[in-house]
Amino acid sequence: MKSSIFIKSAIAMMAAVALGASNASATVVSREKVLLETVISAEGNVTQKGIIQRVKVSQPAEAKKNDKGVTGETGFGEISVSFSEPVKLKDVTRTEYATDTEAGAAVKTTSEVGMLLQTEEVEKHEQFVKNKWDLSLPRDVKPVSFDDGSIGFRTDTENGVSAVSETRISTPWAVDKHGNPLETWYEISSDGSSITQVVNTQDIEGEIVLDPRITYGQGVYYNWYGSELRTLKAESAASFALAVGYGCVNVNRLRHPALVAVAGLMCVTAGSVVGIEALRFALDNFKESFKDHSCYQWKFGSHHITPVAVKGNCSL
């Protein structure tokens, strides 16, 4: 009799535990569903209103989720963008998302695009919300801000030429719970290890969604001031041909500093100096005078040089 009572009690206890686990699981699923609905709605709103700035890359590289954010390969090496707060991202079955419901965080990857979506609760009269995103960058690569508010990645040399990856974090966006866009911008930390997204929330309260969107590409752009390009253009075609012959192994044997600088940078960022012949054609094709303090850009392998904004492209 006592044995029967014990068995019934054990079964009842197991049923209670199972029911508790089932309820807990249902709660997690419910939170996950709400979070996904929130971020998908926000993304849909900004897409429909044309707020999301799409970046086109010539050599797409796959954006991959990890347990902290997204990562991908560039011409400079691996670049990662992560949530600054601790998160435990878990893939959501049959979707492109990974989420952490406790942190209100989600990540989405589609081909070369990675998105980190964060929900924040804004209190009444709270003027600004600041959310930090951590960056993991290759050595000697730093984040730079462009005129449109987007973030790029650049490496500089001591001889004036710089290289910018086509990988870019788009102009930031943030929306309130009704899908209305909010004023927002990025600030780069002094050591380049993070960016902070600042959102103007002084006229709202309630939930907001904010997001950095990174597009990965392996293409590389090279930038000079006009005075430096003029020096490079003065080099003979034979010198450029010699650079190709030397290759990356013997690039330092070149005599001219301007040529050594760009050839060496090509080896580091594009893996080859062969494209320098195309640069020679691009210099010949540019018929205007190079202006000393203007910034000019050449895409690896192309036959054209174009003027670009100084900010973000040419080192200051």
Predicted regions and their residues:
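Short hydrophobic membrane-inserting alpha-helices and related fusion/pore-forming segments
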Residues: 243-272
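Soluble non-cytosolic domains of exported or imported proteins
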Residues: 125, 238-239, 269
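Secreted/processed peptides and extracellular or luminal domains of membrane proteins
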Residues: 21, 25, 254-257, 273, ...
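Alpha-helical transmembrane segments
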Residues: 17, 269, 273-281
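Hydrophobic core
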Residues: 13-23
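Residues that cap or anchor secondary-structure elements
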Residues: 27-216
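Bacterial N-terminal signal peptides that target proteins for export
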Residues: 1-10
